[in-house]
Design a protein with these regions (language model features):
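Conserved S-adenosyl-L-methionine
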Residues: 28-34, 139-142
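Rossmann-like NAD(P)-binding element
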Residues: 55-119
Length: 330
């Protein structure tokens, strides 16, 4: 097989459904032959290792461990799904305290064992806040760490494609910004369906509101249908994000990134923005939309600030004014 790089990729939470799918996707896409599977659950990660070995990918060097030092040392790229999954009846925010403690330890391990890592993708919920926690604790630069947000946009894209009976890739500009949660801002003004603006497609306001609701509840719908949280779609999107950071195809769907921007009025949060991920990291631009869309984005930002302040109160991260002491790059 030909590989994009030989650098070490670590999959955290590799014993779970998302983690194991990420391992397989990374190998099928030919990202790197050197992949370390890390999890605290020995039977699970051992089982994934055996299955991946039994796929018989040629030329690969797949290892597994439950030791963080062994896993992280020498890592250049990391994807972490190493948090508790959402269950039926739960919101992403319900996972806040426990998963942010996991994210803090994750960030500490990066700082301790692989400070030279190139890029990190965090996908366990609530992803905006777990990623922010990991960034603060890791000491990394903001452009080196991203969180999963694209899944909300692909859910919106899917819903519109089904609505109008077109191939999904014929729907463009279907993006959500702000938080990866029930307060996400769903933007319609730049959507085109087979090249035609959504505003010209005859979609009623009532139907648009239904599609928005379906998008926001996309993760809950999967849980109801399958009896477990999504794993194929977050795994694939996360692997495509790290592929871009390795120098592969640029990732242009929205990603969660650190924003501290006076002009935009968004300060000290991780949030989904119009972004590009490439070999140099993640870069965001100013969102454009209607007055109503931008107001919903402001509301989403305020919700993210509230969750950020909660983890400060819990002592998981220090007060904002002290972040630079923990991470001079912020």
């Amino acid at each position: 097989m030909n590989f994009l790089t030989n650098d070490k990729l670590v999959i955290v939470g590799a014993g779970g459904m998302i983690g194991s799918n990420m391992v397989q996707s990374a190998l099928m896409l030919g990202l790197t032959p050197n992949i370390c599977l890390y999890d605290i659950f020995v039977p699970g990660v051992h089982g994934v290792f055996d299955e991946i070995q039994q796929c018989a990918f040629p030329g690969v060097n797949v290892t597994y461990t439950v030791n963080p030092e062994e896993a992280f040392t020498g890592a250049k790229y990391i994807i972490s799904s190493g948090g508790a999954p959402r269950k039926e009846g739960m919101t992403r925010e319900d996972l806040l305290k426990g998963n942010c403690k996991i994210a803090a330890e994750f960030g500490d391990n990066i700082k301790k064992y692989c400070p030279e890592v190139e890029h990190v993708v965090v996908i366990f919920n609530p992803a905006d806040v777990t990623a922010l926690t990991a960034l603060i604790h890791s000491g990394l630069k903001p452009n080196q760490l991203t969180s999963l947000a694209a899944l909300d946009s692909t859910r919106l894209q899917q819903a519109l494609a089904l609505e109008f009976g077109v191939q999904q890739d014929k729907v463009t500009g279907a993006h959500t910004y702000g938080g990866h949660g029930e307060q996400m801002a769903v933007f319609a003004s730049l959507v085109k369906v087979d090249g035609k603006p959504l505003a010209e497609m005859g979609l009623s306001d009532e139907r648009w509101e239904e599609i928005k609701h379906h998008t926001v509840q996309g993760g809950s719908n999967i849980i109801k249908l399958r009896g477990r949280s999504s794993f194929q779609s977050p795994a694939y999107n996360a692997v495509k994000m790290i592929e871009a950071a390795m120098g592969g195809e640029k990732f242009t769907l929205p990603a969660g990134c650190y924003v501290n921007h006076d002009k935009l009025g968004f300060k000290n949060v991780m949030m989904a923005m119009p972004t590009t991920i490439d070999k140099t990291g993640v870069h965001f631009t100013e969102p454009t939309g209607t007055e109503e869309e931008l107001a919903s984005l402001q509301k989403s930002y305020e919700h993210l600030c509230k969750m950020r302040d909660e983890i400060v109160e819990l002592g998981i991260v220090p007060p904002v004014a002290e972040w630079k002491e923990m991470n001079p790059n912020l």
